[in-house]
Each structure stands twice: as C-alpha cells, then as structure tokens.
Amino acid sequence: MSKSRLTVFSFVRRFLLRLMVVLAVFWGGGIALFSVAPVPFSAVMAERQVSAWLHGNFRYVAHSDWVSMDQISPWMGLAVIAAEDQKFPEHWGFDVASIEQALAHNERNENRIRGASTISQQTAKNLFLWDGRSWVRKGLEAGLTLGIETVWSKKRILTVYLNIAEFGDGVFGVEAAAQRYFHKPASKLTRSEAALLAAVLPNPLRFKVSAPSGYVRGRQAWILRQMYQLGGESFMQQHQLD
C-alpha cells in the first residue's frame, strides 16, 4: 500500500473514531439529561420539520406539549403497551421471542415486513435517530436502547414515548393528539379514545385518527380486548407505570 493511501486511511480512521466519541458523548448526555428533564423535541420531529421546509411548506410546525405521567390518562399508557409491547414491564429493551417470530415471518413474506421493536427501542429511535432501515441504524438503536433501559425507569421510558410519539401529520405527543382529535387534555382520554390513538401508531401518516378506516377500527377493537386481558388499570398500578 502506497504512503498516500496509508495517509488517507489513517485520516479516515481518526475521523470516524472522533465522530464515534462525539456521538457517544452527545447521546450519553442526552440520555442523562432526559432522564429528568422534559424532552423539547426529537430526531423524528426535526426530520419532519426539515423535510417540510425543503418542500416549501413553511407553515408546518412539528412540536409537542410535554406532560407528565400524572397528566396522562392511565388508559393511554395501557393502550400503547397492549398495542405495541405487551412484555414492556418485563424485558430489558428487547423482546427476543417477537424478534425471532418477525424474522421467520419476513423470510416467508418478503413483501410484507413485520417489525418487532419494543417501546424502548421505538423511544430510542424516535428520540435520537433518523428514520429508515439499515444495519447501522439498528446497531445504534440497540446501543441507545440499552442506555435508556439502564438509566431510565420503565415509567420514564413510557412517559417520553407518549410525549414524542407521532399520531398524525405534525401531531407529536399524546397531549397534542388529545387536543387535536378529541378537544380535551390527555388526562381525560377514555379507554376507547386511547385505543384509537394507539391503533394508528404503526403508520400515523397513513392511518388517520380523524377518519379511521375499517382496519383502524378493527385494530382499535383488538387493542381494547388486549387491554382487558392485561387487567385494565390495575396492570399499570401493578407495574408502577401510572
């Protein structure tokens, strides 16, 4: 290998190492800070805002209204757990059984990809990472998930998740969603309303809370049944999530 190539390789290696250190400090600081402080914005919110500006939409504003867990109806937390991650109180960020099932399903159905991200993984991704699918992003997501699972309580993870989740175009967080769709604060959401909000989470830009399709209504009904089977509000109390 020539001297010039060695110089370039050495420069790239040093740059990547420094970048990794900077990102580790940035993300580590974010995990520590947001373990106690309200989250003002997320990576997904920033991505949506920049995308809107690039497309000439300067009226678009991505924001969320932070609320603590005692300002959120217990039905809402239960609804997203029932819909997205029923083993949330038990695992350390990853549901291995669901991952194995998703991999097996995706091998058989390449055109219908199934995910297996837990609430913890979704929180890490939405808060710190860009949208999309790649092994690099998945690797970073895994590290960030371990970080928040180590530093944050389950209640804190759920609180942050509910405050940064996307419920529609420009609608981030359960407080903004409750006000937009039901004209009430998140603390007043009913069991049915919470299930409807949770029903659009797989794809909130495609599925509409304001005009729910038959699929969304069916998913809402399924979530309501799962909420009942989990034990209702007592589930949240039992796992100290309320």
From Swiss-Prot:
- Does the UniProt entry include the keyword Manganese? no
| Domain of life according to the entry | Bacteria
Molecular function, one GO term: peptidoglycan glycosyltransferase activity
Look up the EC number in the record and give it: 2.4.99.28
Write down the top EC class of this protein: transferase
- Where would you say this protein principally sits, based on its record? membrane
Q: How does it sit in the membrane?
A: Single-pass membrane protein
Coiled coil segments of this chain: none
Where found?
Cell inner membrane
Query: What's the protein called, per UniProt?
Result: Biosynthetic peptidoglycan transglycosylase
What are the top taxonomic ranks of the organism? Bacteria, Pseudomonadati, Pseudomonadota, Gammaproteobacteria, Enterobacterales
